[in-house]
Amino acid sequence: SKYINKDYQKVTEYLNYLYKEIDLLFEHLNKNHIELNVGTVFFGGGSPTILNREDLKKLVDKLRGLFDWSNVEFFTVESDPRRVDEDRLIYNHEICGTNRISFGMQDLDPEVQRRVNRIQPVKLFEDLLTSKVRKMYKEIAFDLLIGQPGQTLESMSKTCDEVIRLKPTLVQLSLMAYKPWVAKYQVQMLAEGPLPDFLERKELLEIIHNKLKAGGYIRTGFECYSLPGSPMTKAFDEGNAHYGASGHQTGGRVNFIAVGSSSMSNLGNDYYVQ
């Protein structure tokens, strides 16, 4: 689900409902004497960085009071580069305890960004990924979205060059799903021509694969590339990488329990809930 909103009161209302959902979940777990062994916490969605500092900390404190946090190896906050700065990333780490960032950067080509109305120049990422921030976070992930309007082999090649230069530890790929009946804003994506077709998307994926491989990245999953020595590469080498509801994961845990709008859960290979 998607909801474009600039009224923070709506965010506050959403958080109140989220807290109720969390309480219902843990009421059920406690009633059935189920104690969670949590190894990964992931704040995703559109972007949890819409939350102000106080509300993010309040949400983290809420969760810390419900289960043992000592086994949490990775705590990710998916971050919109247009909503955060270096100081906010430092706050998220030092005060809230995050140690992994995921940027839904999608594409770095200015023309593609214009056509999808998501302007985020390369300089945004340069200013965010300072040496201080890089030292604080175990993993920095970029998400590339394939099939967007205006993407060409040349533009994707340049985007890959910039990604390699920015040096995230992890690059994950996904194909854009054109569903204007769900996301009405997608209708305008066809205003200047069709989206890349199946063969064009295949060629884009080949460009990405060849570029990232030449840039030192290792393919550690069907749609996942990581740097040598990174957490994902280590997990892949040790046979502990797996694919879950939020993409490729490190560690041996296979259950993913999610809450909130558009959340996705999976319990082993038997159950999937959205």
What are these regions (language model features)?
Residues 3-28, 36-274:
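C-terminal scaffold of the Radical SAM
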